[in-house]
Each structure stands twice: as structure tokens, then as C-alpha cells.
């Protein structure tokens, strides 16, 4: 049976993984340094945390479910204990992209990240509809990259990732560089920033006298139908008035060179700021 050493097992992400690995075909050894995390594992899931040395002894796969800022240090601390052929799984592209993993050609590095439950979905169960992050009840897609290692290891890593992010719909294979374009580039630098602007726009119309709930209802409803048209979820076209508003509004809101956020140096700078 494949043995997994799960680092950060009692943390925010690690606890999700610890939960999802219950009943899986893997033997999981849980590593958690904080007392609160160890207690959470014990009382919530009935798991006892073990030392890093005990977890790594004979482990086939090591999952680093720790913050981006800690991955480099944790990886460096355990490198000497990793046997050739061990697979190291990281849950975000930032640290691998920034070069924070040890220079060990004899290890397999697999990077995976969730797409999170899509806005347009077929969920009917209320618990699934309220699972906005995913990995509990709501179905989601995922992306993965084999950064280094034998080609056969991709399927091995993908099988683990499908448990991590379960329930999974589509599984997309990308490179680490492409994953960095997706996050922080697409999802955070672009999408999150524009969503913050939308919230500020709601605040502005409220300050100008519109009822807050009315403003929220109006915006969120329009986001649904406008998004469905823009991304091809439904057949339809915008009104002439809407197209004219976009024509004149976009130059006011967006710099002409805004797409430079996807240039390699901009992606690298963004990742340096978070790692």
C-alpha cells in the first residue's frame, strides 16, 4: 500500500486533506507541529500526529500542506530524509515556480491546485451549493503539473490529487508556468482585483443613495446573466446600450497595457511577494 506523509495535517488545508483521505487506499501519516493542530486532528478525526522522521520513514509520497512562505524551509528540512523516487506534492505553484524546492533530480515534484466549484453548476443539494471552496460537497475541476519526474508519475500524482480535491469533475494537465499564469495571474491579480472594484462600486452607489440590498441584488443578478453570455453558458447578445457602456467604460476602468500582468517578469514579481 502506498504511504503518504502529510505535513501540516492539522492546519487549514491539511485538515481538509486529512478528512478526504479517510477511507482512501493510502496509508497516511499525519505531521503537525502546532499543539492546536494536533488537538484538532485528534478530537475532530481521531488521528494522532507523528514526528516528521516517523512519517518519512518509508514514505512513497510527501504532501506539503503548509503555507507558501513555509514550503521552502520545510522542504529543505526534510530533503536529506527523502529517498530517491519519492514524490513531493505541493498544493500551489508559487513556491515551485519561485525555485523553493530542493535541487533533487531524483525526486518527483507534482503540483496541483483546485479550480474551486464553478459559478455555473448543476448542484441541487443545498450543502453542495454552499460549499464555495470545494473539496467537501461541491464538485470542482482541478489543474495539475508534473514539474519533474518520470512520466508515469503523473497518473500517480493525479490519483492522489483527485482525493485531495474530491469530488472532482475535469482534471486538467498544465505546466508549472501555466499554473502560475492561472494563479496568481488570472484568478487573483485579475479576477480578485476586479471583484474588489465591483464591491467598491456597490459601496459607491450606496453612498449615492441606493439601498445596499437593492444594489447587491442588482449587481449579483446581472453578474449571473452577463457572465453566462460572455462565457458562452447561454446563447444571447448584449443590448446596444450595454455594448456602448462597455465600449466607453472599459477604457476608463482599465489601463491600455493591463495585460502585462501576464508577462513572465510580472508573474515572477507577484510570486516573490507572496513567497
Regions found by a protein language model. Give the residues of each.
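Rossmann-fold NAD(P) dinucleotide-binding segment
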Residues: 56-100
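A short glycine-threonine-serine/GTX helix/turn-capping micro-motif
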Residues: 183-192
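NAD(P)-dependent Rossmann-like dehydrogenase/reductase catalytic/cofactor-binding core
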Residues: 138, 210-275
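NAD(P)+-binding Rossmann beta1-loop-alpha1 motif at the extreme N-terminus of oxidoreductases
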Residues: 1-45
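Short acidic low-complexity segments
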Residues: 45-59
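Rossmann-fold dinucleotide-binding core
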Residues: 91-183
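Amphipathic alpha-helical segments within well-ordered protein domains
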Residues: 199-206
Amino acid at each position: 500500500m502506498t504511504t503518504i506523509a502529510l505535513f501540516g495535517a492539522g492546519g487549514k488545508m491539511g485538515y481538509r486533506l486529512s478528512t478526504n483521505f479517510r477511507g482512501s487506499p493510502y496509508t497516511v501519516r499525519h505531521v503537525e507541529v502546532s499543539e492546536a493542530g494536533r488537538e484538532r486532528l485528534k478530537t475532530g478525526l481521531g488521528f494522532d500526529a507523528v514526528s516528521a522522521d516517523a512519517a518519512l520513514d518509508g514514505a512513497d509520497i510527501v504532501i506539503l500542506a503548509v503555507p507558501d512562505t513555509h514550503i521552502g524551509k520545510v522542504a529543505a528540512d526534510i530533503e536529506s530524509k527523502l529517498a530517491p523516487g519519492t514524490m513531493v506534492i505541493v498544493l500551489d505553484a508559487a513556491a515551485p515556480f519561485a525555485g523553493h524546492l530542493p535541487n533533487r533530480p531524483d525526486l518527483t515534484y507534482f503540483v496541483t491546485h483546485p479550480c474551486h466549484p464553478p459559478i455555473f453548476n448543476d448542484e441541487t443539494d443545498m450543502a453542495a451549493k454552499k460549499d464555495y471552496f470545494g473539496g467537501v460537497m461541491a464538485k470542482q475541476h482541478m489543474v495539475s503539473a508534473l514539474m519533474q519526474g518520470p512520466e508515469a508519475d503523473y497518473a500517480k500524482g493525479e490519483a492522489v490529487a483527485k482525493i485531495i480535491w474530491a469530488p472532482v469533475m475535469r482534471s486538467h494537465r498544465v505546466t508549472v508556468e501555466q499554473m502560475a499564469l492561472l494563479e496568481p495571474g488570472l484568478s487573483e491579480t485579475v479576477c480578485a482585483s476586479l471583484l474588489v472594484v465591483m464591491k467598491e462600486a456597490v459601496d459607491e452607489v450606496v453612498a449615492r443613495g441606493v439601498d445596499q440590498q437593492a444594489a447587491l441584488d442588482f449587481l449579483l443578478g446581472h453578474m449571473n446573466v452577463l457572465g453566462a453570455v460572455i462565457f458562452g453558458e447561454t446563447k444571447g447578445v448584449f443590448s446596444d446600450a450595454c455594448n456602448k457602456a462597455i465600449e466607453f467604460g472599459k477604457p476608463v476602468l482599465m489601463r491600455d497595457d493591463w495585460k502585462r500582468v501576464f508577462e513572465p517578469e510580472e508573474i515572477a514579481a507577484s510570486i516573490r511577494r507572496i513567497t
